[in-house]
Amino acid sequence: MQGEKGMEVRYYICKHCGNIVEKVKDKGVPVICCGEPMQELKAGVTDAAVEKHVPVYTVEGSHVHAVVGETKHPMLEEHFIEWITLNTNQGIYRKQLNPGQEPVADFCLCDGEQVEEVYAYCNLHGLWKC
């Protein structure tokens, strides 16, 4: 999603405790957790099966249907998609997921709202987007 002056939303993770934050506006100040700067998450940089991690979405009218992977991602206790985020030209929507659920999310768009990006976060293989 583009924020002030075309800034892309960024995600950061703490290498100590695993906290993840979403930065929607960047004023150049580092994000700190556990006494150290957090590490920026980059989408799709982990060596993992692309066909199971990259989100795929369809839009029908005001309905957005997102699925993680052309081949659905496993949703096991030890390996699952934690969340799916839809970024639009007007806002950000997130669905939290748990093991055993399907790696899918449904969202509704408002008038004039357009999809910009869809992100998915795998507990083992990190951040992915389309």
Model-derived features: positions:
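Exposed aromatic-hydrophobic patches
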Residues: 67-68, 104-111
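Residues immediately within or flanking Cys/His clusters that coordinate Zn2+
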Residues: 11, 30, 119
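Short Cys/His-rich "knuckle" micro-motifs
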Residues: 23-28, 41-44, 130
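Cysteine-rich micro-motifs
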Residues: 27-37
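Cys/His-rich microdomains that often coordinate metals
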Residues: 21, 37-38, 126
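Short amphipathic, basic-aromatic surface patches that mediate peripheral association
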Residues: 68-76
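Short acidic/polar inter-strand loop motif in beta-rich domains
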Residues: 123-130
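Short cysteine-rich clusters marking metal-coordination/redox-active sites
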Residues: 14-17, 33, 122
